[in-house]
Amino acid sequence: MKQLRLEPVVQVRGEINIPGSKSISNRALLLATLAQGTTTLTNLLDSDDIRHMLASLKQLGVNYRLSQNNTVCELDGLGGVISSESAQELFLGNAGTAMRPLCAALTLGQGEFTLTCEPRMEERPIGDLVDALRQLGANVVYLKNDGFPPLTINATGLSGGDVEIAGDLSSQFLTALLMVAPLAKGSVNIHVKGELVSKPYIDITLALMAQFGVTVINHDYARFEIVAGQRYVSPGKVLVEGDASSASYFLAAGAIKGGEVKVTGVGRLSIQGDVKFADVLEKMGAEIEWGDDYIIARGSQLTAVDLDMNHIPDAAMTIATAALFAKGTTVIRNIYNWRIKETDRLAAMATELRKVGAEVEEGNDYIKITPPAVINTAEIDTYNDHRMAMCFSMLAFADCGITINDPDCTSKTFPDYFKQFASLQG
C-alpha cells in the first residue's frame, strides 16, 4: 500500500484555484445531455466520478469533445430522453453523483439499462429513489439486494402525477427525481417525506435546471411542482464553480496555520452551500474575507463550536480535524448521512481521530471531539474515501506530522490535492 508522510508544517500562505465542483459537473453533464443544443462546460472537474459519467454518456450515444486537460467539454444534447435499441450495461464505480441521476434519467426513454458499480456502492442505498420512480411507472429490478445497486431498468418512460420521496437520508434522491420530472409525460408533484437533509444541494440542482430553461415551483422544500411540457434548452456555456467542499481544506489550513490562504473559484456568489464552511471557521475565531469568487482565511487561535452541520455535510468533515487545533470540545450534529457516503464516515472519523489521541464520542448522528494535550503521530487509514485523506492532511500542522495511507484515493474529486497542499507551505 502506498503511504504519504507529511512532515510538520510551520506556516502556510498562498493562493489556490479550486478545481470544478463534482456535484455541479455531473449534474450539468446530464442536463446538457437531455437539452436541445450544444453546451460548452468550462472548469469541469477531471476526476474518477466525472470520468464514470462521461464514459457512460459516450456508451449511450452522446457526442462530446474534451479539451486536452479534460476541463472543457463541448457536448451535443439529445434534445430529450435517452433511448437505446440494444441492452446497455454501464459501470459507475463508487460515484453516487452518477449512479443516482443516471438511474432516474434512464427511466425516461426506451430500452434496457443495467447499472453496475464497485462493492462500496452496492452498500449505498438507492431504494428511496427507486420507490419514487416506481410510483411514476418505472420498471426497476434489483440484481442483488433490495434497495441497493446493481440494478436493471426496463425503460418505457415516466407518467406524471403525485409522487412521494423520502428526504431524510440523502438529497441526491430528490435531485435525481427533480432533474427527470420535466421530461415525464405529465405534470409532476413531488412530496418530500421527513425533514430534507442537505437542502443547499437541492438549491444547486434548482439553479442548474433554471439555467437550462426549466421552472420548478418550490413550496418550502416540502413539495415541488414541475409543470408538464417543459424541455431543457442549452444555455450555450456553463461555468462549473470551484468545488466548495475542496476549498474547505485550504481555508482550514489558513485558519490553523496562517499566514493567509486565498481560494479562488468560489465566493459569496456561489450556488454551493458548502461555502458556509467559512462561516463556521469564523465562529471558531478565524478571520475570513469574502469576494464574489474568492475567500481568504487568516489564522488565529481557534475555539470549539457546537453546531448543526447538516447543511454542509461534506465540508463539516474538515471541522472534525480542525477541532484538534481548537480550545475545548467541538460537537458536529445532525450528520447521519455521513454513514452512507464513500465509507461510514462517522465511524471512520472517530477511529482515526482516536489514533492521534483525541477523546471522541461517536453518536448515531453526531460526533464530539476533545483534542489531546499533545497530538500523536499515526498512520491514518483512508477507507478509499477521498475526503478522509484530505481532512487528515490537517495533521501536518501538528508538531509530529502524519502519515496518510492510500493518498491516491483523492483521485475521486481532487487528483493533485497533495501537490496543491504542498504549494502552500513555506
Swiss-Prot record:
Signal peptide: none annotated. Phosphoenolpyruvate binds at residues 22, 96, 124, 172, 345, 387, 412. The keyword Cytoplasm applies. Pfam families: EPSP_synthase. Pathway: Metabolic intermediate biosynthesis; chorismate biosynthesis; chorismate from D-erythrose 4-phosphate and phosphoenolpyruvate: step 6/7. 3-phosphoshikimate binds at residues 22-23, 27, 170-172, 198, 314, 337, 341. GO terms for molecular function: 3-phosphoshikimate 1-carboxyvinyltransferase activity. The keyword Ligase does not apply. One of its GO terms (cellular component) is cytoplasm. InterPro entries: Enolpyruvate_Tfrase_dom (IPR001986), Enolpyruvate_Tfrase_sf (IPR036968), EPSP_synthase (IPR006264), EPSP_synthase_CS (IPR023193), RNA3'P_cycl/enolpyr_Trfase_a/b (IPR013792). Monomer. Belongs to the EPSP synthase family. This is 3-phosphoshikimate 1-carboxyvinyltransferase. It comes from Shewanella baltica (strain OS195).
